[in-house]
């Protein structure tokens, strides 16, 4: 599994629409609204670097109105309390979950 962390700047009036659109992209597992230099942190979990590139370069920046800028990092190692590959198995989590 390849994990990308995208820091995203969004037009303020488009924040909710951008968040909803991002959650519909295959491979996007979480979207966090944050304070600071960026507006959103987007977690992307895919099977290859080329798939990550497609999500960031095409689906995020070209297909979603309101996104001004992205900066993407690739995780070199993940340490977690759960098996992330099993947790994010697409067959088990096909629809985005919203937690209040």
Q: For the regions a protein language model found, what residue spans apply to each?
A:
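A compositional/biophysical signature of low hydrophobicity enriched in polar/charged and small residues
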Residues: 1-100
């Amino acid at each position: 599994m390849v994990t990308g962390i995208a820091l995203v700047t969004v037009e303020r009036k488009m924040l909710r629409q951008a968040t909803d659109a991002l959650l519909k992209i295959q491979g996007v597992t979480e979207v966090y609204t944050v304070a600071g230099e960026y507006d959103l942190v987007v977690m992307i979990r895919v099977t290859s670097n080329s798939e990550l590139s497609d999500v960031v370069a095409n689906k995020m920046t070209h297909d979603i109105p309101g996104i001004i800028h992205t900066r993407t990092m690739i995780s070199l190692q993940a340490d977690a309390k759960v098996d992330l590959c099993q947790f994010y198995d697409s067959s088990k989590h096909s629809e985005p979950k919203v937690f209040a």
